[in-house]
A protein has these predicted regions:
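Conserved N-terminal subdomain of the carbohydrate kinase-like
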Residues: 1-60, 236-246
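Short beta-strands and strand-loop turn motifs
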Residues: 17-20, 47-55, 81-90, 102-103, ...
C-alpha cells in the first residue's frame, strides 16, 4: 500500500471522497491515517464507519490502541456512521459503554430515542462533525422523538429500524419496517450508499433515505431467498436503481 500511495502522490492524485470501514488492527489504522494526511484535500468528503462492536459488546479485534486510532479517524471525518455500541465506545471507552448500553436497554420507546438523540448530539459536537449517523436502532412505539424521513409506520406497534441523523445541529430519524433478522454487511452497504451520494453532492437527507430504502429492498429479498445471515444480503438486484438516480 505504501508503494501505491507513493506513486499516487507523484501523480497528484486527489480523491473526491474517502470512506473507511472495518480495520483489523492498529497497523491498518495507521496506514489509513497516513493516507488521509497525504491525500485528503479541502473538498474531499471523508466518511468513517468506526467498526468496533455491536449489541453492547466490543469485537474481538478491539483494543484501546485501535480505539485511539478510530478517534483520530473520526476527528478527520465530516460524517460517521457508528451503531449505538460504537457511538458509546467513541465517547466513553469500553467499560463505560457497557454500562450505558445496558441502561439504554432498560428504557422504553420515546425515552430511549431521546437519550440516543443526546448521544448523537454529543458525538457530533465533541468531534466537530458535519453529521453523526447512528444506525440500527430498534423501535416499537408509534410516536417518534424527532421528525422522520420515512413514515412507513402505519402498523401500530410494529418493529421498526431507525437511523438517527444529527446534522449541523438538526436532529431527525429515518425509519423503515424491520424485516427478518440481523445480516452481515448491512452497515457496510448503508455507509457505501451514503458516501457515494455525498460525493455526488446530494443532501444528507436524500442520501440517508436512499440508503434505507435500498437496504429495505435488499433485506426483504434476502428473507425471501432464505439466505444465511452470515452470507450477507441480496443487494445486487437493486444496484441498477442506484445507478439511475440523478443528483
Amino acid at each position: 500500500m505504501e508503494q501505491i500511495m507513493d506513486e499516487w502522490e507523484k501523480r497528484g492524485f486527489s480523491p473526491d471522497g474517502i470512506y473507511t470501514g472495518f480495520l483489523a488492527d492498529e497497523e491498518q489504522a495507521d496506514k489509513i491515517l497516513d493516507f488521509l494526511r497525504r491525500f485528503r484535500k479541502e473538498k474531499t468528503v471523508v466518511l468513517v464507519d468506526p467498526v468496533m462492536g455491536d449489541n453492547g459488546g466490543a469485537y474481538g479485534i478491539y483494543t484501546e490502541g485501535l480505539r485511539e486510532r478510530m478517534v483520530q479517524l473520526v476527528r478527520s471525518a465530516q460524517v460517521i456512521t457508528p451503531n449505538l455500541t460504537e457511538a458509546l465506545l467513541l465517547l466513553y471507552g469500553k467499560e463505560e459503554m457497557e454500562k450505558r448500553y445496558t441502561g439504554l436497554l432498560e428504557l422504553d420507546g420515546e425515552k430511549r430515542l431521546e437519550q440516543i438523540e443526546k448521544i448523537g448530539e454529543k458525538l457530533a459536537n465533541e468531534y466537530c462533525l458535519q453529521a453523526a449517523v447512528i444506525t440500527g436502532i430498534e423501535y416499537v412505539k408509534e410516536q417518534k422523538a424527532a421528525p422522520a424521513l420515512i413514515s412507513d409506520r402505519n402498523e401500530k406497534n410494529s418493529m421498526q429500524m431507525g437511523n438517527l441523523v444529527v446534522e449541523n445541529g438538526q436532529v431527525y430519524w429515518c425509519f423503515a419496517p424491520k424485516t427478518g433478522g440481523s445480516y452481515s454487511g448491512t452497515g457496510d452497504l448503508f455507509a457505501s450508499v451514503l458516501s457515494a451520494g455525498l460525493v455526488k453532492r446530494m443532501s444528507m437527507m436524500t442520501c440517508v433515505e436512499l440508503a434505507v430504502k435500498f437496504l429495505s429492498k435488499a433485506i426483504a429479498e434476502t428473507v425471501q431467498e432464505g439466505t444465511d445471515r452470515n452470507d450477507g444480503v441480496c443487494f445486487e438486484k437493486y444496484l441498477e436503481e442506484l445507478c439511475k438516480i440523478e443528483k
